[in-house]
A protein has these predicted regions:
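Flexible, acidic/histidine-containing loops and adjacent segments that form or flank the divalent-metal
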Residues: 1-86, 148-210
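Active-site environment of divalent metal-dependent phosphoester hydrolases
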Residues: 12-13, 34-35, 84-90, 110-115, ...
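Extracytoplasmic/periplasmic, Sec-exported soluble proteins
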Residues: 19, 60, 79, 96, ...
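Active-site neighborhood of phospho(di)ester-bond hydrolases with catalytic His/Asp-centered motifs
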Residues: 77-83, 100-111, 126-133, 156-159
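Active-site catalytic pocket residues across diverse enzymes, especially alpha/beta-hydrolases
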Residues: 91, 95
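Short, conserved loop/helix-junction motifs that constitute active-site signature segments
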Residues: 96-100, 119-124, 146-150
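N-proximal accessory regions
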Residues: 124-127, 207
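Active-site-adjacent alpha-helix of alpha/beta-hydrolase-fold enzymes
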Residues: 127, 137, 142-154
Length: 210
């Protein structure tokens, strides 16, 4: 088959559904390269640029993560995989080419090496969903960043943080799995978007939460 190396700015072709909003899937970062702002936005400097110190260079493959923006009508979902701190900042400064989003897949399981406040403050998500583990991710620094992001109205977690720092958890109704690993049922967080892209629902079907 054909092998393609994706780069920032590439669009991923997807089959469209007749009568529904157009789904656009755009790679916004890959191999530490980031998408360029539109020509008419190059002078719109991000006021958050430089507001948070950089961290030591990340030499792991996490910094090379592929970040993807899904646009479906007016709905926008950001998934940056394991992208780390300095590249997150590079993605939205000195100009923010992403704009405002609806749902943010919390980067890198909620580890402190990711989820730069500059990124969160720039894209201003309404909802965050953290794919953390019972003891992995959901670090105090990331949890504090999410709490401090004024645009966020609901913070979902796939697992409850069962470490000693249990204060770093969202409310129980927004957590899919609350037991230890041996008792975990693998409940999931579901996102459904209306065909016109004008509304969406986040739910945990196993708990009847929506």
């Amino acid at each position: 088959g054909k092998r393609v190396v994706i780069k920032a700015g590439d669009s991923i072709p997807v089959k469209q559904r007749k009568g529904a909003a157009e789904l656009v899937v755009t790679c916004i970062a890959a191999q530490q390269g980031v998408i360029k702002p539109a020509d008419d936005a190059k002078d719109q400097k991000n006021p958050l640029a430089g507001s948070v110190p950089a961290k030591p260079e990340d030499l792991s493959d996490n910094a090379n993560s592929v970040a993807t923006l899904f646009s479906f009508g007016n709905f926008r979902f950001l998934d940056c995989g394991d992208l780390t701190w300095n590249v997150e900042s590079k993605l939205v400064t000195p100009v923010n080419p992403i704009g405002i989003i609806d749902v943010y897949q919390v980067n890198h399981h909620g580890l402190a090496s990711s989820n730069n406040p500059i990124l969160l403050g720039s894209v201003q998500p309404t909802v965050s969903v953290m794919n953390n583990g019972h003891t992995k991710g959901c670090t105090p620094q990331t949890f504090a960043t999410l709490n401090a992001t004024k645009s966020i109205k609901a913070m979902y977690q796939v697992h409850k943080n069962l470490r000693k720092d249990s204060e770093n958890n969202t409310t129980d109704e927004l957590i899919a799995n609350k037991t230890d690993r041996d008792s975990c049922k693998g409940h999931y967080v579901k996102m459904a978007v209306s065909p016109d892209g004008d509304s969406y629902t986040i739910s945990i079907p196993a708990h009847g939460h929506s």
